[in-house]
Design a protein with these regions (language model features):
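Long, contiguous binding/interaction regions
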Residues: 2-91, 99-198
Length: 198
């Protein structure tokens, strides 16, 4: 059983719940490895999951499976939620997770990290920083705290895309006052992300 891979995700390209159950058993380890490859930790508490057709298709199919959704309207709602996170060839899109297992610490840190999503950046070797465009779908913070989940997009110009495809190094960073951090992306992660770019 194979899943149809398309440039976008449509209702017609999704598997039925029964077909997905079989597909999932055979392919979950490979999908989890792909997700891990495209996940970049920044410090102890930030994790950026760079999305792809594979990660988003998996997320949609999992939501449909868990919620036992098979009606057209419910399927369309999941598509409307996740398809905008597909990279378009000129950008990288991701889900930023602020991970604090302790409830009290999470509450405290989310209040200290208001605006963190706008301070996330990537820096392609030899090029200026590109800051994230965050939460285009809705407001995810208020005056008291930020959300533990943000959706971010990094737009890369043609020179940056060419540099990444040619093997340039890339840093992921954050220059929020209360969470300054940066890391160099692993070559295997960059190889996967380079495949998103045209």
């Amino acid at each position: 059983m194979t899943m149809t891979i398309t440039p976008t995700i449509t209702r017609e390209s999704l598997l039925s719940l029964e077909a997905y159950s079989k597909y999932r058993k055979e392919n979950k380890p490979a999908i989890m490895a792909h997700r891990k490859l495209r996940s970049v930790r920044l410090g102890e508490n930030l994790n950026l999951q760079f999305e792809s057709e594979t990660t988003l298709r998996y997320q949609i199919q999992e939501m449909l499976r868990i919620e036992k959704v098979f009606e057209e309207e419910g399927i369309q709602q999941e598509l409307d939620a996740y398809v905008p996170l597909l990279p378009t060839g000129h950008n990288w899109k991701g889900t930023l997770l602020l991970e604090y297992p302790d409830v009290n610490e999470r509450k405290r840190e989310l209040s200290r990290l208001i605006g963190i999503e706008d301070r996330m950046f990537i820096e392609v070797e030899g090029h200026a920083r590109v800051y994230a465009i965050a939460d285009e779908d809705l407001e995810r913070e208020n005056d008291e705290k930020t959300s533990a989940v943000h959706f971010v997009r990094f737009e890369l110009n043609a020179a940056m895309r060419a540099a990444v495809k040619a093997g340039a190094g890339v840093k992921l960073g954050c220059d929020h006052t209360n969470y300054p951090a940066h890391t160099s992306m692993a070559p295997e992660t960059l190889a996967s992300l380079a495949g998103d770019l045209i």
